[in-house]
From Swiss-Prot:
[4Fe-4S] cluster binds at residues 38-39, 104, 133. One of its GO terms (biological process) is aerobic respiration. Disulfide bonds: none annotated. It comes from Thermomicrobium roseum (strain ATCC 27502 / DSM 5159 / P-2). Binds 1 [4Fe-4S] cluster. This is NADH-quinone oxidoreductase subunit B. Its EC number is 7.1.1.-. Its cofactor is [4Fe-4S] cluster. The keyword 4Fe-4S applies. Its main location: membrane. The lineage of its organism: Bacteria, Pseudomonadati, Thermomicrobiota, Thermomicrobia, Thermomicrobiales. It is a peripheral membrane protein.
Length: 185
């Protein structure tokens, strides 16, 4: 016979393994920094003692994409760099998440030239867009919090309706975020 929740010890929490893994996945993101321009300086400053993004959110920097589940692309992505971004994204383990940080990564910034990709979402799927030129660390905080909320919704949908429904939700969220950026040249 099993114990009911009322009979169990008050310091013992009963839950499913899936819920525990989902909580750990959103509360302990391992991120791959991909800093390409001035936005990378703000990303680095967000990890310093004043803001301490990594410690506050339980995030760890990873040098290898195989160990990361979050990629933060900060700065201008050139057409020569685009295959490298795609290769690093493909090497990440599933589920993988992407934050596009700054105007250059979001829409190409002021560089409307033949050599610049007009938004990293033309190379890899992006989950969160952090605006600014360069964005302040607080904006990156907000982006990480939004990503954690999306991970919670994704995991709930995956548990309740299956992985296809969760992926459809993710794609709808990406389309909505892309359309909020407005038309591109």
């Amino acid at each position: 016979m099993g114990m009911s929740a009322a009979q169990s010890h008050p310091n013992i929490i009963t839950t499913t393994a899936d819920w525990l893994f989902s909580w750990a996945r959103r509360s302990s993101l391992w991120w791959l920094q991909f800093g390409l321009a001035c936005c990378a300086i703000e990303m680095i400053s967000s990890a310093m003692p004043r803001f301490d993004l990594a410690e506050r959110f339980g995030m760890l920097y990873r040098a290898s994409p195989r160990q990361a589940d979050l990629m933060i692309v900060a700065g201008t992505v050139t057409k020569k760099m685009a295959p490298v971004v795609r290769q690093l994204y493909d090497q990440m383990a599933d589920p993988k998440w992407v934050i596009s940080m700054g105007s250059c990564a979001n829409v190409g910034g002021p560089f409307d030239t033949y050599a610049v990709v007009q938004g990293v979402d033309q190379v890899i799927p992006v989950d969160i867009y952090v605006p600014g030129c360069p964005p302040v660390p607080e904006a990156l905080y907000y982006g990480v919090l939004e990503l954690q909320n999306r991970i919670i919704r994704y995991e709930r949908l995956k548990e309740r309706y299956g992985p296809e429904a969760a992926e459809a939700y993710r794609e709808e969220e990406r389309q909505a975020a892309r359309s909020a950026l407005g038309p591109r040249s």
